[in-house]
From Swiss-Prot:
<dbReference type="GO" id="GO:0005743">
    <property type="term" value="C:mitochondrial inner membrane"/>
</dbReference>
<dbReference type="Pfam" id="PF03364">
    <property type="entry name" value="Polyketide_cyc"/>
</dbReference>
<dbReference type="InterPro" id="IPR023393">
    <property type="entry name" value="START-like_dom_sf"/>
</dbReference>
<keyword id="KW-0496">Mitochondrion</keyword>
<dbReference type="GO" id="GO:0045333">
    <property type="term" value="P:cellular respiration"/>
</dbReference>
<dbReference type="InterPro" id="IPR005031">
    <property type="entry name" value="COQ10_START"/>
</dbReference>
<feature type="transit peptide" description="Mitochondrion">
    <location>
        <begin position="1"/>
        <end position="34"/>
    </location>
</feature>
<comment type="function">
    <text>Required for the function of coenzyme Q in the respiratory chain. May serve as a chaperone or may be involved in the transport of Q6 from its site of synthesis to the catalytic sites of the respiratory complexes.</text>
</comment>
<dbReference type="GO" id="GO:0048039">
    <property type="term" value="F:ubiquinone binding"/>
</dbReference>
<keyword id="KW-0809">Transit peptide</keyword>
<keyword id="KW-0999">Mitochondrion inner membrane</keyword>
<dbReference type="InterPro" id="IPR044996">
    <property type="entry name" value="COQ10-like"/>
</dbReference>
<keyword id="KW-0472">Membrane</keyword>
<comment type="subunit">
    <text>Interacts with coenzyme Q.</text>
</comment>
<protein>
    <recommendedName>
        <fullName>Coenzyme Q-binding protein COQ10 homolog, mitochondrial</fullName>
    </recommendedName>
</protein>
<dbReference type="GO" id="GO:0005739">
    <property type="term" value="C:mitochondrion"/>
</dbReference>
<comment type="similarity">
    <text>Belongs to the COQ10 family.</text>
</comment>
């Protein structure tokens, strides 16, 4: 019985191998190119692949900037607080003087107040870090010596941009607590990806620029403490 089973098994293997050989021989006749007797490649029948179905369409590739990032716009936020040896009035004057931004704010090429001078105002700003140069309009509202708020109302760069500065008296003499908050969302996916890469460095340089401006105008102040929070939503 065992010998018969073995014989049947071997026979089945032979048949299987023969069928496989026949399939391979038939497939070889469909080869795109064959070597002719003269040794020259000669083109034969070519079967074109079927057109791709809807389910197999190629998915557009993501930006080369960040291949793992989702193809969506992201609103980004940053907040920071500092206690420094300048009065609330001094820091307020630095931040509220929007027309002077072009002199000390990084990447600010032009800054011009187009409406209002003391108190609430409208300003046009031009920012640029090559190859990007953009203009936008900002509505600035203030609470003298306490708060400066700016909101982008027109421009091709941002879907949303808002900055907020608050100044409160510090624990000692000529000092104050400065709170800074910014939230923004670019219209362009490319700009959004660039912001994700350089976000921390750009915002920190912006905040440092205002403290450096105060130092230039009022003398050396002491930077006492710093806390920052960043998140993208």
């Amino acid at each position: 019985m065992a010998e018969k089973a073995t014989s049947l098994f071997l026979r089945a293997m032979e048949i299987s191998e023969k069928q496989s050989f026949d399939v391979m021989r038939r497939n070889s006749s469909c080869t795109i190119r064959h070597l002719s007797s003269c040794g020259i490649l000669e083109t034969r029948r070519v079967s074109l692949p079927p057109p791709p179905s809807a389910s197999s369409q190629m998915v557009p590739s993501r930006s080369f900037i960040n291949l793992t990032a989702p193809l969506i716009m992201r609103r980004m936020e940053y907040s920071e607080s500092r206690s420094i040896n300048y009065s609330p009035e001094q820091m307020y004057d630095v931040v509220a003087n929007v027309e002077q931004y072009q002199q000390f704010v990084p990447w600010c090429k032009k800054s011009k107040v187009t409406r209002g001078r003391n108190g609430d105002m409208r300003a046009q700003l031009e920012i640029g870090f090559p190859p990007i140069v953009e203009r936008y309009t900002s509505e600035v509202t203030v609470i003298p010596n306490h708060q400066v708020r700016a909101v982008c109302t027109d421009g091709s760069l941002f879907n949303h941009l808002e900055t907020l500065w608050r100044f409160t008296p510090g624990a000692a003499g000529q000092s104050c607590n400065v709170e800074f908050f910014v939230t923004f969302e670019f219209k362009s996916l490319l700009h959004s990806q660039l912001a994700t890469m350089f976000f921390d460095e750009v915002v920190k340089q912006m905040v440092n620029a205002f403290e450096t401006r105060a130092k230039k105008l009022y003398g050396t102040g002491v930077h006492r403490q710093q806390a920052s929070l960043r998140r993208a939503i």
